[in-house]
């Protein structure tokens, strides 16, 4: 099979290569998937780059945790009726606090546990499906980890990003009123089109003042946070008493110093979101919800660009540059 690989961390153009690798076989409890689209998440790029001291955890890595395709074979213990099923995949490569799998979705074929290949919603194509594993499931967990959000007001920082854009739609579908923060006017349009009540330009507006104005001084029930270190003072200031901050990243500073009493005075709840560690029951609920929302056309996946496998290094650079209104996907 044709696959993208790397054997050392570093710049994309220097370490990623394309070549033939042995075809995998479906083992006990596994399915073999012909990959059609491979989603790229910031975590994939960080692993390849060696961000924050990350080391190679396997001698050779086929990158990318998310993808979509069709099942072409099954291993022992898996019903053969799954052959031909369109699926999206999660946790195909890597992980946090564990080495995880070595071989991800940036290849023509992948063998992985059957439960990690989920039936693709009828209304989504492979390119969209390749972004359900991390962006959409992280968004689901950030919105619903503590139950229903019906009637709540939610602030979503980074609302135009891959996770944020999904979170806006999932929260609105759940009955919440959403305020999103963005960094420019096109991003604001993108977020309002997804259903947000308001989109605030953090570069042009006093976000804290505007949130309190919009909520009549009450604040928000929940904050979904893309960069905890950068925004924790804001989050504490706009949070209602006993509200929750659900943070899924802190890239600007992996070891932020917490303003304890800003949160303690509100009786705040801090919820840290890790898409690789969603409890099994919650994951099944999330998978079912994403399918329902997608098939009801309440969830769309924004795509900024697609690249062929041969141009995977360019795709990684596109993710690193940031600012995309949508996901970057490698087609295979």
Residue positions per predicted region:
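C-terminal hydrophobic helical "lid"/dimerization subdomain
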Residues: 1, 281-332
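Glycine-rich beta-strand-centered segment in the early N-terminal region that forms part
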Residues: 22-40, 51-93
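Short glycine-centered segments of the SAM/dcSAM-binding site in methyltransferase folds
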Residues: 86, 153, 177, 243-244, ...
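N-terminal Rossmann-like NAD(P) cofactor-binding module of classical short-chain dehydrogenase/reductase
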Residues: 88, 223-224
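Glycine-rich phosphate-binding loop and adjacent beta-alpha segment
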Residues: 95, 182, 230-298, 332
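Mid-domain Rossmann-like dinucleotide-binding core that forms the NAD(H)/NADP(H) cofactor-binding site
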Residues: 130-204
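Short amphipathic alpha-helix with an adjacent loop that forms part of the alpha/beta core around
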Residues: 207-217
């Amino acid at each position: 099979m044709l696959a993208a690989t790397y054997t050392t961390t570093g710049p994309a153009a220097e370490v990623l290569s394309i070549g033939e690798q042995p075809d995998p076989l479906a083992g006990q409890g596994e399915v073999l998937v012909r990959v059609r689209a491979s989603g790229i998440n910031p975590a994939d790029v960080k692993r390849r780059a060696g961000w924050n001291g990350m080391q190679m955890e396997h001698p050779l890595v086929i990158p990318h945790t998310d993808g979509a395709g069709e099942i072409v074979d099954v291993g022992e213990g898996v019903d053969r009726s799954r052959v031909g099923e369109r699926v999206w995949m999660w946790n195909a490569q890597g992980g946090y606090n564990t080495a995880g799998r070595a071989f991800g979705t940036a290849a023509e074929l992948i063998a992985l546990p059957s439960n990690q290949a989920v039936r693709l919603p009828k209304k989504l194509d492979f390119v969209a499906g390749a972004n359900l594993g991390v962006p959409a499931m992280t968004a689901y967990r950030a919105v619903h980890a503590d139950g229903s959000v019906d009637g709540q007001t939610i602030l979503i920082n980074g609302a135009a990003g891959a996770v944020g854009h999904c979170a806006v739609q999932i929260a609105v579908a759940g009955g919440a009123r959403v305020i999103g923060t963005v960094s420019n006017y096109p991003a604001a349009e993108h977020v309002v089109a997804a259903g947000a009540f308001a989109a605030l330009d953090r570069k042009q507006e006093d976000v804290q003042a505007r949130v309190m104005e919009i909520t009549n001084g009450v604040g928000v029930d929940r904050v979904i946070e893309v960069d905890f270190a950068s925004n924790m003072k804001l989050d504490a200031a706009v949070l209602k008493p006993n509200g929750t901050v659900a943070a899924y990243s802190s890239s600007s500073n992996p070891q932020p110093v917490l303003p304890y009493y800003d949160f303690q005075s509100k009786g705040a709840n801090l919820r840290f979101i890790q898409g690789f560690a969603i409890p099994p029951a919650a994951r099944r609920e999330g998978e079912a919800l994403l399918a329902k929302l997608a098939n009801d056309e309440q969830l769309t996946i924004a795509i900024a660009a697609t690249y062929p496998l041969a141009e995977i290094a360019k795709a990684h650079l596109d993710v690193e540059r940031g600012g995309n209104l949508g996901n970057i996907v490698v087609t295979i």
